Every structure is written in C-alpha cells, then in structure tokens.
C-alpha cells in the first residue's frame, strides 16, 4: 500500500474495510525486508464516507429548523416524513435512541408491518437482528469452546425480533441467557465462562401485540402490556424494570409502499458513523444542569428518563449545550422520556402492586 493511501485511508482499510475502487500496481522487485510484495495498492477511491467530522455535522444542524431536521432524520432511515403525523415521527426518533445512547434498553410491541425490523436492519451495520430461533448464551455473550465474544460484546445494538410471537421461529431466550442478559442490562457487564466482559451494546425487545388498528390501541384482553412476551419474561419484574422505555408500537401505522423515502437524506453509512460518534458524547450533562426530578422517584426511573432524554437531545439538538438549550427543547425530550418510562412503571405496578407502588414521574426545569 502506498504511503498516500496508507495515510488517507489506512485506518479504515486495515480495520473495518470500505467499498471503493483500487489501482493495483504489479512490481516483482518490490521488497519489504527480505520478502517480495509484488502487488501494491497505489490509489484508492472510496464509494462511501471514510472520514467524517462530528463537529461539522453539529455545525450543519444549526442551518436547519427543528422540524426540517426531524424530517431529514426520518428520510435518512428510509421513510417519507410527509406521510406521518408529528407523533409518529417522534416515535420513529425513539427507535433511533439505541443507536446514539450506549447501554440503552428499549421495548416496542405493536402490529406487524410497521417498519420496526426494516429500520433496525437498514440503519447501521453495527446493529444485529436476532430474528429467529433460540438465542443461546454462547451466541449472545461468549463461546466457551471457541473463546469468541458474542454479538452483545461486538455490536452497538442487538434487536430481539418477534419476541412476542407464538410462531415457532420467533426469537427465544434460554434460562442462562435471561439471567446473563438481566445482569448485563443493569450493569453493562457480564460474566461468562469465568471471564468478566463489558459492552456498550443497547438492547431492543421487539414484537407483536394484538391491536385495534383503526383506533391505534392495544386490545384490552391483556392484564398488562408485557403479557405478550414469552412466559419466562412477561412477569419477571427484575428483568422488566431494567427496560428504560416502552414504545407504544400500536400507534405506528402499517407501512405502505408509498411511505418509504423518495427524497434526499443522509447517506446511510455516514449517518451510522455519526450515530456511533454520538454514542461517545455525554448529553446527560444538559439534564443534570437544567432539570430536577421529584423526590421518591426510583434510581432506575431517574436513569431511564435521563438516558431517553439524552438520546433524543443527541438526535434532535446535537448543537445545543447546557448553557444555550431552550426550555421548550428540553421539555420535548423529557416529556417523551417520562411517558415511555411511565408505561414501564404502570405495567410493573399491575404485575406486582405490593412491590411497585404508585410514584409520580416528572421533572422541573431550573434556570441557567
């Protein structure tokens, strides 16, 4: 590889790889030490973005109105924003929070064909969809024989698709996986085969729920909204309490062919890399500086609301700082965050009313 190619593209070509065209030179006399290397890459033209600047992305956000920016994000993940209400657009943004917020746990139950799997499969190569069969602890965490780290240790987002399904090929977790996943969702680390491993991977539980499609609400033959989950999960309050947000998938419309994007959005590879860089930024500082939560709220509820709020800030207001973010911008993110966590808490109260008593979830904005 020539010095120029190595300098400009070496960090990408020698790690994750990149699509592009290469000019390869044949020189049988080219040596490195005592070894001949007759084939040498002398030029490379990438098809995709190989270098990007998060600061440039943040600077360009300032040129858009909030509504136009949200529409751009919706278009980027493959949907036509003109076909959706503001509420549906906001729920699509919530689907993106696991991509920008590390160690984030989301559940979405809703009818089929609402674009859940489509979005997760097409947004980033660093997401992995467990779409069928039983997911074992070896596959997810660590393989004791091969010594390979599992997908939760390798990916940014792991999606358990069709968790709430009676189909034979639905995603299922064995007992060992549930115990390990429960600890991981709380701590961001896990022990497997005598090895302690950490990860920033976010977890998404996705599945179906019986829905009144016309009125966009679940059918009321459920005792609680976790009931469609597999038997081993549906009333495991320790597991369910680790979920940061419950996205009401029954509010999402069935996606028609005309609902897919037809205009301009960000290149998917570029957007995926930006999301990955945003994962490394801490936007919870915005909330610590400007928000107070009511006394009596559990630490898990507090953490859940902060993580959802921070994720939405990264998506919609990445250009804001704790000093210049507007109250209405904070309210937009936190109202959604409180609603999504409240849905989790209400189901826990229905499952175990003695363990989970009613507590007010909310927030108060304070002056700069």
Regions found by a protein language model. Give the residues of each.
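C-terminal helical "lid" subdomain and adjoining coupling/linker elements of P-loop NTPases
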Residues: 255-259, 285-358
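Eukaryote-specific, cytoplasm-facing alpha-helical/coiled-coil scaffolding segments in long proteins
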Residues: 122, 269-272, 335-342
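Extended, charged/polar low-complexity intrinsically disordered regions
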Residues: 1-76
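Extended alpha-helical interface modules used as scaffolds for assembling large macromolecular complexes
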Residues: 250, 262-263, 273-279, 339-368
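Phosphate-sensing "switch" segment of ASCE/P-loop ATPases
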Residues: 196-203, 208-313
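Conserved phosphate/pyrophosphate-binding and hydrolysis machinery centered on Walker-type P-loop NTPases
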Residues: 59, 63, 85-89, 260-264, ...
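Conserved ASCE/P-loop NTPase catalytic core
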Residues: 80-215, 220-227, 241, 362
């Amino acid at each position: 590889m020539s010095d120029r190619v190595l300098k400009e593209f070496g960090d990408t070509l020698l790690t994750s790889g990149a699509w592009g065209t290469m000019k390869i030179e044949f020189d049988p006399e080219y040596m490195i030490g005592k070894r001949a290397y007759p084939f040498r890459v002398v030029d490379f033209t990438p098809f995709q973005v190989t270098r990007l600047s998060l600061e440039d992305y943040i600077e360009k956000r300032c040129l858009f109105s909030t509504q136009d920016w949200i529409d751009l994000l919706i278009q980027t993940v493959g949907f036509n924003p003109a076909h959706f209400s503001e509420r549906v657009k906001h729920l699509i943004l919530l689907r993106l929070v696991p991509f920008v917020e590390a160690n984030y746990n989301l559940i979405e139950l809703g009818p089929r064909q609402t674009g859940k799997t489509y979005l997760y499969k097409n947004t980033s190569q660093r997401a992995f969809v467990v779409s069928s069969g039983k997911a074992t602890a070896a596959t997810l965490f660590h393989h004791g024989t091969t010594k390979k780290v599992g997908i939760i240790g390798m990916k940014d987002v792991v999606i358990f698709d069709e968790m709430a399904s009676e189909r034979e090929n639905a995603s299922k977790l064995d007992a060992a996986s549930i115990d390990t996943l429960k600890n991981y969702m709380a701590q961001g680390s896990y022990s497997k085969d005598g090895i302690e491993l950490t990860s920033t991977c976010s977890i998404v539980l996705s599945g179906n729920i019986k829905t009144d499609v016309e009125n966009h609400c679940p059918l009321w033959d459920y005792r609680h909204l976790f009931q469609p989950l597999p038997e081993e999960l549906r009333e495991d309050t320790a597991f369910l309490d680790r979920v940061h947000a419950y996205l009401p998938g029954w509010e999402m419309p069935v996606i028609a062919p005309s609902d897919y994007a037809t205009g301009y959005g960000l290149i998917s590879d570029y957007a995926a890399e930006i999301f990955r860089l945003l994962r490394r930024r801490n936007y919870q500082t915005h909330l610590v500086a400007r928000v107070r939560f009511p006394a009596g709220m559990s630490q898990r509820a507090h953490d859940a609301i902060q993580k959802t709020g921070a994720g939405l800030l990264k998506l919609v207001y990445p250009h804001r700082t704790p000093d210049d973010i507007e109250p209405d911008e904070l309210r937009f993110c936190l109202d959604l965050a409180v609603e999504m966590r409240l849905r989790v808490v209400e189901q826990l109260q229905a499952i175990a009313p003695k363990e989970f008593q009613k507590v007010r979830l909310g927030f108060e904005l304070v002056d700069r």
